[in-house]
UniProtKB/Swiss-Prot annotation:
The keyword Methyltransferase applies. Its EC number is 2.1.1.192. This is Dual-specificity RNA methyltransferase RlmN. Disulfide bonds join C109-C345. It comes from Pseudomonas fluorescens (strain Pf0-1). Belongs to the radical SAM superfamily. RlmN family. Binds 1 [4Fe-4S] cluster. The cluster is coordinated with 3 cysteines and an exchangeable S-adenosyl-L-methionine.
Amino acid sequence: MTTSTVKNNLLGLTQPEMEKFFDSIGEKRFRAGQVMKWIHHFGVDDFDAMTNVSKALREKLKAVAEVRGPEVVSEDISSDGTRKWVVRVASGSCVETVYIPQGKRGTLCVSSQAGCALDCSFCSTGKQGFNSNLTAAEVIGQVWIANKSFGSVPATIDRAITNVVMMGMGEPLLNFDNVVAAMHLMMDDLGYGISKRRVTLSTSGVVPMIDELAKHIDVSLALSLHAPNDALRNQLVPINKKYPLKMLLESCQRYMSALGEKRVLTIEYTLLKDVNDKLEHAVEMIELLKDIPCKINLIPFNPFPHSGYERPSNNAIRRFQDQLHQAGFNVTVRTTRGEDIDAACGQLVGQVLDRTRRSERYIAVRELSADSDLAQNAANTN
């Protein structure tokens, strides 16, 4: 009987982790930088193609390591230039990655989990339940796949991917270690060299991990707000029952202050017809956010089957935006992109092998975000 050796997947290793790996196989640490450039700058997954690495080391690497990204199931291109990749991860589920071109800017929307346990009522991902956390290699692998697809070299003036947003499937802060590792690779010059201001993590509000985030990484923060009061947010975003608005906004302010720079919080607000789109909601929002440096991104709801919600009229959207503008807020309305390939905000579904029944998901959220578990999870990043 033979046993196969589990190889180290180098794709998800940060620079310190890669250096430690080369230490472990008796090689000099500078080799880490050489290999990382081949992997992330040039999309190479074949050690034999790494021509500035000695043949002896290449043979050693082939025996103990690999470069393995998620499997690309499909790639679709929208009429507006938006691209969507469906990729299969180790759990067997599929997740989605979306690229949105806009002038000289190209934004990649990356998933952090297969499915999501938060069960936000207007999100198609949440309707599927939760299957698994993605590994660091599966998170950064989405950037790697997209970059290879464009044949683009990171950190060059004409690179395709200029911004990354952790706004795909899943709640990034409930996959803390792997998401933080992947974001470090996004910003590392040996990785993708993206500015910290151009890497954004979006959260529905896992308060203890927002506080933990500033200890480990400096990235832009976006809050999925979607309601201006606790009663409504409890219905739309169930985790609000555990971390209500006052607690949540205070944690966001602590995060922004900890960065030590003049930074603003991005507020994401999905507009739902006759639910949260009335002028009184805008007035409540003004009062809620009046002391918080922020910019507001209004997202007209993108319908999906059996959602139970509708997109507001253009007039209703404009009135809501104008009310916020008049109060002095910087407000934009997100243009729907990639709708013809189901790549618009809130439409990402993949093919998730659901491990949670719908009635159990809020319990799962409470367990996932229990303070003791979160503290242990944070400690593991050290």
